[in-house]
Amino acid sequence: MPELIINGPEGRRIEARYHHEAKSDSPIALVLHPHPQFGGTMNNQVVYALYHTFAARGFSVLRFNFRGVGRSQGIWDGGPGELADAASALDWLQIVKPDAKCCWIAGVSFGTWIAMQLLMRRPEIDGFICVAPPSNLYDFSFLAPCPSSGLMINGDNDRVVPSSCVADLSAKLKTQRGIKIDHEVVSGANHFFENKIDDLTNVVGSYLDMRIAKDADEREQRRAREKEREAARERERQRENEEVVAPVADTDDD
């Protein structure tokens, strides 16, 4: 997998890895890594697993290092700068795949906090995956309302982010009309999902399969409705044309 350098905010370099799908309308996904000051990088095993879970389902996928990590330029900014990095990465991904049929974002721990802020700013994001969202450490109240449906997943042996905190966050978001938040707990998993990566990818993969099938069905229904509307418009045009060309009754008296 070749190294990729993309342009970030203020001309800074961002180190990334990219999986490209040849189909012009392939869906896209952006994956954000855990806290840089606690060893988080784009090569984190959970980030890597999410990246390949998306790729296995036909997504074009991008993961990258936040500023100051690896070969990405800059220094840790506590959130605003990292959000700008993520926005630049999504911009790049959308330039490469302008015809993508849908857009997803995923994050791990600190990366979920950045991912969800980006979700609020980018209405084109259709779904999300949040792994161990640290709602006990960061304020997620900006998700009011949450604009997209998605999955939150954590381990029940997580000593960094208690499962109850993720459950509370998920429950709050479920109150939004038209938004469905799924919450899954992986038994025995800690914050880093050590020895539980397969369980994690099985849950995420099943969720993506469900959403992909559902979204495809909804797109087909929309196409069918639009086809019917166009047929109705065509019938109306034909009726109007027939009225215009209909012969006028002869009113001359012989």
Regions inferred by a protein language model and the residue ranges of each:
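Catalytic histidine-centered segment of alpha/beta-hydrolase-like enzymes
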Residues: 74, 189-201
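Short alpha-helix in the alpha/beta-hydrolase fold that links the catalytic acid
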Residues: 148, 162-172
